[in-house]
Amino acid sequence: MASSSNYNTYMQYLNPPPYADHGANQLIPADQLSNQQGITPNYVGDLNLDDQFKGNVCHAFTLEAIIDISAYNERTVKGVPAWLPLGIMSNFEYPLAHTVAALLTGSYTITQFTHNGQKFVRVNRLGTGIPAHPLRMLREGNQAFIQNMVIPRNFSTNQFTYNLTNLVLSVQKLPDDAWRPSKDKLIGNTMHPAVSVHPNLPPIVLPTVKKQAYRQHKNPNNGPLLAISGILHQLRVEKVPEKTSLFRISLPADMFSVKEGMMKKRGENSPVVYFQAPENFPLNGFNNRQVVLAYANPTLSAV
């Protein structure tokens, strides 16, 4: 069912519970988070600094961590992988080289906390925050992930102690067929239809449904939310081969508009939306998911 686009509906995605405890731009000292020393990441990925001068280029940023997990009365499990998606960003939003430099020069720790019975893994960046940066990690200094979505599920539900032993920053260039809102949409105040897949994951922003599609529904006055809700059953998720934590949705070409996006026009090809999610994100459809309105740039504030 589609939700309203009021302030409270959108603000739950700007400030979900895992982040609200510390507030924006407040970096927490290491001694308040963990006894361990921070670790500096290595780098892998599709980094071509010439791309930072091309406005229509987007990159996905992921931290790939190796952690040791210790629990009370259980032996330590070493070498557990974790995939921690940081977000997708275009050069319209922030220079690529500056983002990579800030991520690589930061020192990181990892901790666990529980909120309303849900267990989270929090990655903490120890360094100076960048208040207007599109990536939450650089904007706020910490980012929380649902535990059972970022580490293997075959561990008990007891309280764990995490020891971060290795960290890699993965920068992945999105393919040329990627749809992203255009520059004026990113820096303006236009909201887009989006699919919510979990209360603590950001909604997946979609292109606007073509006006012709509105007329196929009983009440076209409800606009893009109703139009998207009526065709969720047609959307399918695919894992992008050889990419970490990157997924895509191919949209029906006859129902979605790509005019406002950065996609290169290739005949009648369908627009493709890329998004980040944990590696074990379910590849089923979006039917019965909640539809909301959201900004493409999470640094914008609802008014």
UniProtKB/Swiss-Prot annotation:
Membrane topology: Peripheral membrane protein
Entry keyword set: Host cell membrane, Host endosome, Host membrane, Host-virus interaction, Inhibition of host innate immune response by virus, Inhibition of host interferon signaling pathway by virus, Inhibition of host JAK1 by virus, Interferon antiviral system evasion, Membrane, Viral budding, Viral budding via the host ESCRT complexes, Viral immunoevasion, Viral matrix protein, Viral release from host cell, Virion
Primary location: virion
Annotated InterPro entries: EV_matrix, EV_matrix_protein_N, EV_matrix_sf
Alphabetized GO MF terms: structural constituent of virion
Subcellular location: Virion membrane; Host late endosome membrane; Host cell membrane; Host endomembrane system
Top-level taxonomic group: Viruses
GO CC terms: host cell endomembrane system; host cell late endosome membrane; host cell plasma membrane; membrane; virion membrane
GO terms classed as biological process: symbiont-mediated suppression of host innate immune response; symbiont-mediated suppression of host JAK-STAT cascade via inhibition of JAK1 activity; symbiont-mediated suppression of host type I interferon-mediated signaling pathway; viral budding via host ESCRT complex
Short sequence motif named PPXY motif, residue ranges: 16-19
Note, other: Most abundant protein in the virion.
Family classification: Belongs to the filoviridae matrix protein VP40 family.
Function description: Plays an essential role virus particle assembly and budding. Promotes virus assembly and budding by interacting with host proteins of the multivesicular body pathway. The interaction with host E3 ubiquitin ligase SMURF2 facilitates virus budding. The interaction with the nucleocapsid and the plasma membrane may also facilitate virus budding. Specific interactions with membrane-associated GP and VP24 during the budding process may also occur. May play a role in genome replication.
Comment, domains: Late-budding domains (L domains) are short sequence motifs essential for viral particle budding. They recruit proteins of the host ESCRT machinery (Endosomal Sorting Complex Required for Transport) or ESCRT-associated proteins. VP40 contains one L domain: a PPXY motif which potentially interacts with the WW domain 3 of NEDD4 E3 ubiquitin ligase and the three WW domains of SMURF2 E3 ubiquitin ligase.
Subunit structure: Exists as a dimer until it reorganizes at the plasma membrane into multimeric form. Interacts with host TSG101. Interacts (via PPXY motif) with SMURF2 (via WW domains); the interaction positively regulates virus budding.
Protein name: Matrix protein VP40
Species whose genome carries this gene: Lake Victoria marburgvirus (strain Angola/2005) (MARV)
Gene (UniProt): VP40
